Amino acid sequence: LVVYPWTKM
């Protein structure tokens, strides 16, 4: 699982 900065939205 990769969490990108935009996933915080």
Curated annotation (Swiss-Prot):
GO terms for molecular function: opioid peptide activity. The lineage of its organism: Eukaryota, Metazoa, Ecdysozoa, Arthropoda, Chelicerata. This is Opioid peptide. Expressed in the synganglia (at protein level). It comes from the Eukaryota. It comes from Amblyomma testudinarium. Has opiate-like activity. Decreases nociception-related behavior in a dose dependent fashion when administered to mice. May play a role in down-regulating the host defense and immune response during feeding. One of its GO terms (biological process) is regulation of sensory perception of pain. Keywords: Opioid peptide.
